[in-house]
Amino acid sequence: KTAYEIHERLVGSEMCIRDRRSGAIVERKKLNQWFFNISKFSEELLQGLESLDNWPNKVKVMQKNWIGKSFGCEVEFKVESNKPIKNIKCYTTRPDTLFGFSFLALSVDHPLAKHYEDDKEFQKFKEECSKTGTTEESIASAEKLGFKTDLVAINPLDKNMKVPVYFANFVLMDYGLGAVFGCPAHDQRDLDFAKKYNLKITPVVKPEKDKDFEINNEAYTGEGYLYNSDFLDGLKVPSESIVKTIEFLEKNNLGTKKTNYRLKDWGISRQRYWGCPIPMAYDENDQPIKIPRDML
């Protein structure tokens, strides 16, 4: 998606509400573009940083964060619905907090959005989401908004735990699978969302094993021990809890261990007329043709 203002000028993603020059509302529109598939080389790029002896360490740290390697689990949630939807998959780095699960949130660009194309309220919500930026800063500062669907997701660790499914303005399609499970007690964004829509808040991690603990206005994101988590109670967080939860999910065909990267493909379509041309042409049927190397 690309950010435009009313005069059809391309603007930066950080200009998420109004263009600083014209004052016009910024919207995000889908646009066919060309990309270099650098995400395919995420691990190679990450390992290559180790050979850059003369680079400042802070620059290498920035590059590592940009590539954003993470370890987690792809979890499958069964869905109750009157639509032809059987399950929803989501990637998470914290499967150990599943017993604190109180909602499932989808990007408005998620494939399941096609089932709501005729819903006028959803289309209004989707248009509103297009005004939200895609940077971490703009998402963090924006009001958390949701569109409640008629879907109900089932917790894979407890079949009796059923929660609502929302489309939400803070979920992006280009990270993970465009779906996140909400654990309000241990993620501030999820907590803000849960309070806005009066959703259940169940803490499942406490800093000390034998002391009472509760969540008020701030999510707890530190280390500790699992509780309110049935057979996972007492596991040390995160050193034991994540591994043990993934082992259980894999053993019962409920999830798969996964390595993920934040690095996106490199968009090269925004070319000036004096820049290097993209070596592609189109035939009379608008089909792309690669320009032979000997013609470049």
What are the residue ranges of the model-derived segments?
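Short, exposed "boundary/linker" segments that immediately precede the start
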Residues: 2-6
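Catalytic alpha/beta core of large soluble enzyme barrels
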Residues: 110-208, 213-214, 218-219
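Auxiliary tRNA-acceptor-end handling modules of aminoacyl-tRNA synthetases
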Residues: 91-93
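Residue patterns forming the tRNA-binding/recognition surfaces of aminoacyl-tRNA synthetases
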Residues: 1, 13-14, 18-88, 179-295
